[in-house]
UniProtKB/Swiss-Prot annotation:
<keyword id="KW-0997">Cell inner membrane</keyword>
<comment type="similarity">
    <text>Belongs to the FMN-dependent alpha-hydroxy acid dehydrogenase family.</text>
</comment>
<feature type="binding site">
    <location>
        <position position="164"/>
    </location>
    <ligand>
        <name>substrate</name>
    </ligand>
</feature>
<keyword id="KW-0560">Oxidoreductase</keyword>
<keyword id="KW-0285">Flavoprotein</keyword>
<keyword id="KW-0472">Membrane</keyword>
<feature type="domain" description="FMN hydroxy acid dehydrogenase">
    <location>
        <begin position="1"/>
        <end position="380"/>
    </location>
</feature>
<feature type="binding site">
    <location>
        <position position="106"/>
    </location>
    <ligand>
        <name>FMN</name>
    </ligand>
</feature>
<dbReference type="GO" id="GO:0005886">
    <property type="term" value="C:plasma membrane"/>
</dbReference>
<feature type="binding site">
    <location>
        <position position="24"/>
    </location>
    <ligand>
        <name>substrate</name>
    </ligand>
</feature>
<feature type="binding site">
    <location>
        <position position="127"/>
    </location>
    <ligand>
        <name>FMN</name>
    </ligand>
</feature>
<dbReference type="InterPro" id="IPR020920">
    <property type="entry name" value="LldD"/>
</dbReference>
<feature type="binding site">
    <location>
        <position position="129"/>
    </location>
    <ligand>
        <name>substrate</name>
    </ligand>
</feature>
<comment type="function">
    <text>Catalyzes the conversion of L-lactate to pyruvate. Is coupled to the respiratory chain.</text>
</comment>
<dbReference type="GO" id="GO:0010181">
    <property type="term" value="F:FMN binding"/>
</dbReference>
<dbReference type="GO" id="GO:0004459">
    <property type="term" value="F:L-lactate dehydrogenase activity"/>
</dbReference>
<feature type="binding site">
    <location>
        <position position="155"/>
    </location>
    <ligand>
        <name>FMN</name>
    </ligand>
</feature>
Length: 396
């Protein structure tokens, strides 16, 4: 199969993975309206083409939290990454490390902190949820610090799990889920051999290390359902600061007032995110939410963004809308499921090339030169007639 874009990796991953795993990462909440709008809204951001600008000295390098990044991209935290490729977190981290960008380990990773951190030279980031079990949170923070993690990504948009209908149909949950997953694995021998048999243990490494016993998929679903904490408030940041003195990024911001609160409570960064459309359907896409948030806090706090980013052009669009750096989630997981470390490395190379093309044709030599001036129009304003939805009676 020819791989020329992230969409090719998605198609390949769908063939490789058992349906319960593919749809778990590919799907969203409820009717998946926000999931679709994340991609569609970003694709409608029109860039301003410029010519004769002497683009011979192009640089994608940027700095974030005193770290130098080869390009303004980091790999987002993704749960169960090790179910998509053999020891998937280790492979993805290696690809990010080789590219010179951060890798973020999820709380609910298959590979524990202590397995991933020693395999890379660059300090990785660690993602944490607010959970009822504060003992686990403290333990995770202490272990992350001991392993040399540089930045904490604190996910706040999940006080309760979203309603994901696809999971019930695919076998991740629902009636006879375990039996359905077993037969799906049998029908996908490549995955069954590489990950199902040789990728063990399949427990949640960070949680198992704390509980002192293996924590498998069924335990994962139950443990998360029982431990998400709806009482989460901004005061939890003060508690976390007692155990974490490094950069802290608040992930899951969609409203300018919440962004201002993040500044007031001393966060170092925010991630403009709707959890990839996996939590509350019907909320704004990240691309639509980003400009107002940037207007409110740009310069006061680092602004990261995720949800809907599929290529280097999307990265440039997000930066033009106000982000300093973006996080990749689904895109890199499709590549990981298809070809492991090599797949993620190739995807990052593709994104780098796509960014260079976009920057060359918009006249931006450096990341700092990508701004609102790079846009023909911002989201939310009237579309040109050629792009506006057809009204009744119009014909294509």
């Amino acid at each position: 199969m020819i791989i020329s874009a992230a969409s090719d990796y998605r198609a390949a991953a769908q063939r490789t993975l058992p349906p319960f795993l593919f749809h778990y990462i590919d799907g969203g909440a409820y009717a998946e309206y926000t999931l679709r709008r994340n991609v569609e809204d970003l694709s409608q951001v029109a860039l301003r083409q410029r010519v004769l600008k002497n683009m011979s000295d192009l640089s994608l390098e940027t700095t974030l939290f005193n770290e130098t990044l080869s390009m303004p991209v980091a790999l987002a935290p993704v749960g169960l990454c090790g179910m998509y490729a053999r020891r998937g977190e280790v492979q993805a981290a290696a690809a990010a490390d080789a590219k010179g960008i951060p890798f973020t380990l999820s709380t609910v990773s298959v590979c524990p902190i202590e397995e991933v951190a020693p395999t890379i030279k660059r300090p990785m980031w660690f993602q944490l949820y607010v959970l009822r079990d504060r003992g686990f949170m403290r333990n995770a923070l202490e272990r992350a610090k001991a392993a040399g993690c540089s930045t904490l990504v604190f996910t706040v948009d999940m006080p309760t799990p979203g309603a994901r209908y696809r999971d019930a149909h695919s076998g991740m949950s629902g009636p006879n889920a375990a039996m359905r997953r077993y037969w799906q694995a049998v029908m996908h021998p490549k995955w069954a051999w590489d990950v199902g048999l040789n990728g063990r243990p399949h427990d949640l490494g960070n949680i198992s290390a704390y509980l002192g016993k293996p924590t498998g998929l069924e335990d994962y679903i139950g443990w998360l359902a029982n431990n998400f904490d709806p009482s989460i408030s901004w005061k939890d940041l003060e508690w976390i600061r007692e155990f974490w003195d490094g950069p802290m990024v608040i992930k899951g911001i969609l409203d300018p007032e919440d962004a201002r609160d993040a500044v007031r409570f001393g966060a170092d960064g925010i991630v403009v995110s709707n959890h990839g459309g996996r939590q509350l359907d019907g909320v704004l896409s990240s691309a639509r939410a980003l400009p107002a948030i940037a207007d409110a806090v740009k310069g006061d706090i680092a602004i990261l963004a995720d949800s809907g980013i599929r290529n280097g052009l999307d990265v440039v669009r997000m930066i033009a809308l106000g982000a300093d750096t973006v996080l990749l989630g689904r895109a890199y997981l499709y590549a990981l499921a298809t070809a492991g470390k090599a797949g993620v490395a190739n995807l990052l190379d593709l994104i780098e090339k796509e960014m260079k093309v976009a920057m060359t044709l918009t006249g931006a030599k450096t990341i700092s030169e990508i701004s609102g001036d790079s846009l023909v129009q911002e989201l939310g304003k009237s579309l040109p007639a050629a792009l506006a939805p057809m009204s009744k009676g119009d014909t294509a």
